[in-house]
Amino acid sequence: MNKEKAIVVFSGGQDSTTCLFWAKKKYKEVIAVSFDYNQKHKLELDCAKDICKKYNIEHHILDLNLLNQLAPNSLTRQDITVDKSAPKEGVPNSFVDGRNLLFLSFVAVFAKQKGINTIITGVSQSDFSGYPDCRDVFIKSLNVTLNLAMDYEFEIITPLMWINKAETWKMAYDLGVLDIVKEETLTCYNGIKADGCGECPACKLRKKGYWEFEKYLMN
């Protein structure tokens, strides 16, 4: 297994950007892979491109527009507004069915062609937004499936799986990239960079985590 190279699933948001710089500290060669699935806010891809260009990281954008046709939701359709809070039953309407399944599967194909075994993704079960494909059991299951499907030894690493948003901010701080993550990323479901709209679930989670992180720094 090649332990010197890694591919990061990279959206340009807080979590994947933190993982990207975490990977840069650990591996000699890091490649970022983003997906164009006709998401509502193309600024997400612009942030990903800008970060990779600015910090000299090899970056690839793969076309996955089919996902928009298969799974209409509030992140891909202008006529569907984002839920402001989690529903009592089911998943939020910002959940894109099959997104992480497809992202990781396509990245695995890409990784094998490059002779890379390690795939890094920023999913988290501790502070997740009710998305089933952010759970540890899913990642472990998919890792086994991909290994069997391609007769190849992949290792899917999830640095954020068991930490909350405050701890994710602390990781960025410890890596020396807090300002990059705070100012240059896009997490907002309404497509607003940095601190975002402040109203969508992603912004509320990000803001709450930062507030808790600041409290930690002051202690």
Swiss-Prot record:
Binds 1 zinc ion per subunit. InterPro entries: QueC, Rossmann-like_a/b/a_fold. Its EC number is 6.3.4.20. ATP binds at F10, S11, G12, G13, Q14, D15, S16, T17, T18, C19, L20. Its cofactor is Zn(2+). One of its GO terms (molecular function) is zinc ion binding. Signal peptide: none annotated. Zn(2+) binds at C188, C197, C200, C203. Keywords: ATP-binding, Ligase, Metal-binding, Nucleotide-binding, Queuosine biosynthesis, Zinc. One of its GO terms (biological process) is queuosine biosynthetic process. It is an enzyme of class 6 (ligase). Pfam families: QueC. CDD domains: QueC-like (cd01995). It catalyses: 7-carboxy-7-deazaguanine + NH4(+) + ATP = 7-cyano-7-deazaguanine + ADP + phosphate + H2O + H(+). It comes from the Bacteria. Pathway: Purine metabolism; 7-cyano-7-deazaguanine biosynthesis. Homodimer. Belongs to the QueC family. Catalyzes the ATP-dependent conversion of 7-carboxy-7-deazaguanine (CDG) to 7-cyano-7-deazaguanine (preQ(0)). This is 7-cyano-7-deazaguanine synthase. It comes from Clostridium botulinum (strain Kyoto / Type A2). The gene is queC.
